[in-house]
Amino acid sequence: MVCSVVVALLALLSLSGLEALQHAPKIQVYSRHPAENGKPNFLNCYVSGFHPSDIEVDLLKNGKKIEKVEHSDLSFSKDWSFYLLYYTEFTPNEKDEYACRVSHVTFSTPKTVKWDRNI
């Protein structure tokens, strides 16, 4: 009985230690297909390698939040860091700018990464 309590206590302590680890997210913004003006496509924001899991991700068009955005379930890697994919349908053109804005405890202010149509 005492042994199982000690094991449970050690397990809880090791899990609480994970919360102390903080890793900033890597942010990648790209289109599903090569960009062609006037041709529908998908804009993706892949956020990976972050810890803890609490994160806010917004896709932006000309600096304004895009409302119709979908995302994958929160998943974790072998190293216990997390990753997510946010995406939306869009039609690229010469005038509109797209970006991904991420808020995470490791950033003092939200980080915005612009979509580069040439990537």
Curated annotation (Swiss-Prot):
Entry's Gene Ontology BP terms: antigen processing and presentation of peptide antigen via MHC class I; immune response
This protein's record includes keyword RNA-binding: no
Pfam families: C1-set
Compartments, as annotated in UniProt: Secreted
Keywords: Disulfide bond, Immunity, Immunoglobulin domain, MHC I, Secreted, Signal
Span of the signal peptide: 1-20
InterPro entries on file: B2Microglobulin, Ig-like_dom, Ig-like_dom_sf, Ig-like_fold, Ig/MHC_CS, Ig_C1-set, MHC/Immunoglobulin
Cysteines paired by S-S bonds: 45-100
GO terms under cellular component: extracellular region; MHC class I protein complex
Domain Ig-like C1-type, first and last residues per copy: 25-114
Similarity field: Belongs to the beta-2-microglobulin family.
Summary of the function given for this chain in its UniProt record: Component of the class I major histocompatibility complex (MHC). Involved in the presentation of peptide antigens to the immune system.
PANTHER family according to UniProt: BETA-2-MICROGLOBULIN, MHC CLASS II-RELATED
Self-association and partners: Heterodimer of an alpha chain and a beta chain. Beta-2-microglobulin is the beta-chain of major histocompatibility complex class I molecules.
The protein's name: Beta-2-microglobulin
Organism listed in the record: Cebuella pygmaea (Pygmy marmoset)
